[in-house]
Amino acid sequence: GGNSANLDWALSDADTGRINNLRLGESILLGRETLHRRVIDGLHTDAITLVAEVIESKVKQSQPQGEIAQTAFGEKPPAANRGHISQTILAIGRQDADPRGLRSPPGMEILGASSDHLILDAGDHRLAVGEEITFQLNYSALVRSMSSPFVAKVLKAKSRDTTMVTAIASAIGESSQAVAQPTGLGSIPGS
């Protein structure tokens, strides 16, 4: 047996012996082999995205005033003061996805996250409350979002040849939602 790291080996012409179990979730869902992060022909690297709602967006100082300590997660805040930035708070947090595994849209940067919220420097983008921001996910963010008890998972067929998975993350007691929306997993026979 093996996992996504064994995919190239299993598909090679080498004598692999008898393989009876390969867990290929990362390769299939994210469209990459895991040793060298090469794209797998016929699969999409953007099959699943995470969409989070803006719940606050203001121009603020990049650092708070006063003494700055580590976060609740043991991380030190950024040392560089970048002056005023377009700071945006999103309704998605560490309990929903691994922030280190999210790739923000061009011109935006993830600054940090609490259990319930993600802080984003929106750059030159002026975002309004209620707008949605779409992120690409790595395996760590995907696993956390799909196994989170705060995320509902729904499988939808986009077309006859493409399958989509939609996941909705909703914080307890909040009306805002974060959504993982795939754009396609490639062709799946018989779908």
Residue ranges and their predicted role:
Residues 1-184, 188-191:
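Active-site anion/phosphate-binding pocket segments in diverse small-molecule metabolic enzymes
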